[in-house]
Amino acid sequence: MKTLDEIKIQLESLKPVLKDKFQVETVGIFGSYSQGLQKHKSDVDILVTFSEPNDIDLLDFIALKQFLSRKLKIKVDLVEKHALKTRLKDRILKETIYV
């Protein structure tokens, strides 16, 4: 099982590629990993913002999710900050650990 620190280090090293290839402006971890409640089979919840959100289509989003899963070697649940549901937004933003 990966630790939060291992995931943070990997995401930090991927930031240049995330920015250049996928237009990712910010990346953070929320959910069970940010709360220290992850289990052996937990996925990692990743919150992103894009520098040009209107230029990102569904295929780009899926490609980013697959890229992160492959690089981190763990299932990724990817969420775009602007797509957060109102009822969950405050909680998620409070617990997000930005890289």
Residue ranges of model-derived segments:
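Hydrophobic alpha-helical positions that pack around
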Residues: 29
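Short hydrophobic/aromatic beta-strand micro-patches
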Residues: 47-49
